[in-house]
């Protein structure tokens, strides 16, 4: 090989580095959302009803389902069950637990209910994803809106679509 020439593999390294950086950049939102969901489900397993409810709200926001501040947990739970395929029993479990956590004396959620809380949140979130159109599901995974939009905000309340 003559002096001053480079092999083809040396020329490909910068391009591969750019491609690898782009892949990591594109995967970051999905990874952050996954970590957040796992952390919330872990908190739900410790009895945090608000964390369990937030798992479902985040999934709804990611799918473009409106989560307005004016909806009570029971109203949103009913709408997600009736219009978006969330399991009614799981949504009732979450709404009841959130109401108990908000209005009942502390310590009224039995330890055995903690797993049920996390299971209800996971089942509801999975059902919302499963019942959403494929394009909306893909967008929810690769560009989760819940990372920048909180439940009850003006943007979360508007959603991106309404399903009847």
Task: Indicate where each model-derived feature is located.
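Membrane-proximal, non-transmembrane interaction modules
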Residues: 24, 44-164
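Hydrophobic alpha-helical segments
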Residues: 37-43
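Alpha-helical transmembrane segments
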Residues: 19-37
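Flexible, solvent-exposed extracytoplasmic
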Residues: 1-4, 159
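Juxtamembrane/start-of-transmembrane alpha-helix segments at the extracytoplasmic/lumenal side
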Residues: 3-21
């Amino acid at each position: 090989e003559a002096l001053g020439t480079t092999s083809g593999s040396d020329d490909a390294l910068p391009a591969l580095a750019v491609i690898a950086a782009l892949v990591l950049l594109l995967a970051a939102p999905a990874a952050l959302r996954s970590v957040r969901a796992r952390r919330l489900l872990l908190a739900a397993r410790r009895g945090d009803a608000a964390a369990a409810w937030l798992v479902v709200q985040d999934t709804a926001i990611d799918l473009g389902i409106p989560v307005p501040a004016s909806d009570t947990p029971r109203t949103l739970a009913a709408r997600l069950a009736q219009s978006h395929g969330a399991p009614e029993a799981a949504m009732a479990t979450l709404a009841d637990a959130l109401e108990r956590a908000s209005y009942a004396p502390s310590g009224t959620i039995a330890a055995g209910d903690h797993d049920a809380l996390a299971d209800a949140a996971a089942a509801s979130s999975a059902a919302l994803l499963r019942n959403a159109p494929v394009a909306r599901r893909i967008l929810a995974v690769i560009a989760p809106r819940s990372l920048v939009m909180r439940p009850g905000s003006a943007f979360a309340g508007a959603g991106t679509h309404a399903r009847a």
